[in-house]
C-alpha cells in the first residue's frame, strides 16, 4: 500500500504544476497511455489491480469543463476590453468627420453636373469612329451575336452565293464554247 500512495501523489503533483503553469500546460498533461503487450492482453505483470485503480482515480479527478471555463473566461475578458476601447475611439471621431465631409461632397457634385463650363463639344478619337463604321467582315461588329451570316459583302446566304457563282461560271463556260 505504500507504493500505491506514492503512485497517487505523483499525478497530484503534476496536476498542481499544470494548474500553476496555465491553460496550455493543462491541456497537455492529462493524457496518459498504458503500454500494451500482446502476450498478456494489455495488462502489465508488474502492476497490481490496486495500483491501476488508484492511478485511474487520480487521473479522473480534474474535469475538462473546469479547464474550458477558465480558458473561456480569459478570452471573454480580453474581447470585452478591446470592444469597449474601439467603440470609445469611433464614437469620439464620428461627429468631427461627418460635418466637413458633407460640405465638399455637395460642392463637388454641383461642379460635376455644371454644364456652363463645358462649352466645346467632346471629340471622338479616330479609332472609335472607325469601329462604328460597319464595313464588311473585318469589322469587330461582325463577331457579335447578331452577325451570324455576315461575309465580306455584308449579310448574305452562303448557299445562294454559291449557286450564283456556279451559274456565272456555267454561263462563262457556255459562252466560251460558242
From Swiss-Prot:
InterPro entries hit by this protein: PCNP
Post-translational modification remark: Ubiquitinated; mediated by UHRF2 and leading to its subsequent proteasomal degradation.
UniProt entry tagged with the keyword Endoplasmic reticulum: no
GO biological process, one term: protein ubiquitination
Domain of life: Eukaryota
Stored Pfam families: PCNP
N-acetylalanine, modified sites: 2
Segments of skewed composition (Low complexity): 37-47
Modified-residue entries (N6-acetyllysine), positions: 64, 150, 152
Residues recorded as bearing Phosphoserine in the entry: 53, 77, 87, 119, 147
Location of this chain's protein in the cell: Nucleus
Residue positions where Phosphothreonine is found in the record: 139
Stretches the record annotates as Disordered: 1-84, 134-178
Cellular component terms (Gene Ontology): nuclear body
UniProt keyword terms in alphabetical order: Acetylation, Cell cycle, Nucleus, Phosphoprotein, Ubl conjugation
Compositionally biased intervals (Basic and acidic residues): 1-15, 160-178
Predominant place of localization: nucleus
Biased composition (Polar residues): 139-149
Job description of the protein: May be involved in cell cycle regulation.
Subunit structure: Interacts with UHRF2/NIRF.
UniProt-recorded name of the protein: PEST proteolytic signal-containing nuclear protein
Species name: Pongo abelii (Sumatran orangutan)
Gene designation per UniProt: PCNP
Amino acid at each position: 500500500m505504500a507504493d500505491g500512495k506514492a503512485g497517487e501523489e505523483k499525478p497530484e503533483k503534476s496536476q498542481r504544476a499544470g494548474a500553476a503553469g496555465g491553460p496550455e500546460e493543462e491541456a497537455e498533461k492529462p493524457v496518459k497511455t498504458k503500454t500494451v503487450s500482446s502476450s498478456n492482453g494489455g495488462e502489465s505483470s508488474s502492476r497490481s489491480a490496486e495500483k491501476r485503480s488508484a492511478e485511474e482515480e487520480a487521473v479522473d479527478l480534474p474535469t475538462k469543463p473546469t479547464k474550458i471555463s477558465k480558458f473561456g473566461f480569459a478570452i471573454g475578458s480580453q474581447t470585452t476590453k478591446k470592444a469597449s476601447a474601439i467603440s470609445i475611439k469611433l464614437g469620439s471621431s464620428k461627429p468631427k468627420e461627418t460635418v466637413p465631409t458633407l460640405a465638399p461632397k455637395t460642392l463637388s457634385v454641383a461642379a460635376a453636373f455644371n454644364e456652363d463650363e463645358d462649352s466645346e463639344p467632346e471629340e471622338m478619337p479616330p479609332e472609335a469612329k472607325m469601329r462604328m463604321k460597319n464595313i464588311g467582315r473585318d469589322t469587330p461588329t461582325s463577331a457579335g451575336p447578331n452577325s451570324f451570316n455576315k461575309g465580306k459583302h455584308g449579310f448574305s446566304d452562303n448557299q445562294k452565293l454559291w449557286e450564283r457563282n456556279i451559274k456565272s461560271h456555267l454561263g462563262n463556260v457556255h459562252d466560251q464554247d460558242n
